[in-house]
């Protein structure tokens, strides 16, 4: 009687389906990593709160390069601008080891949050160290309104931007309400001039709280 040939053990039965490997298995996009490697570049991610969300810190001088890479790179072209805002970190005190230590005493810090459909990642870019940045309006149409709000509220000047008019404030106003140096007490009174059919700012006495 000939010995029987041993059968191989299969861990997957015929009815069980094998898990397909994701098509795009990237962490932080390598195109951005190599592009900004020589700059003051840092990034963080969270594996507990949102594992597919990265936070990247760049100098403001790299804003034009960032816009060109996001618009021309193959895996980064299919993206959406989720939100854009700014922060005034003048005199900000942060704990050592926190990623905000890179933004300390940099004045205005811009924040752009993008979602990349092919990578299935969300990356928030913090641009620090300058009040003149390149606009991303040419690649993301919704950046027009977002950057106009940032410009009038924080006094940020955008380069290569077609429309920089104020949205909420009067045209030609020189103050920025969201800056820390903006006075918290009233120093002017806004009245409507019925003869000129426009608003006017009248100086009044300072009020101490």
Curated annotation (Swiss-Prot):
Protein location: Mitochondrion inner membrane
Transmembrane segments: none
Entry EC number(s): 7.1.1.2
Top-level taxonomic group: Eukaryota
Record keywords, A-Z: Electron transport, Membrane, Mitochondrion, Mitochondrion inner membrane, NAD, Oxidoreductase, Respiratory chain, Translocase, Transport, Ubiquinone
Catalysed reaction, written as an equation: a ubiquinone + NADH + 5 H(+)(in) = a ubiquinol + NAD(+) + 4 H(+)(out)
Entry-linked SUPFAM superfamilies: Nqo5-like
One Gene Ontology term, aspect cellular component: mitochondrial inner membrane
Pfam families: Complex1_30kDa
Oligomeric and partner information: Complex I is composed of about 30 different subunits.
Protein name listed in UniProt: NADH-ubiquinone oxidoreductase subunit 9
Organism: Paramecium primaurelia
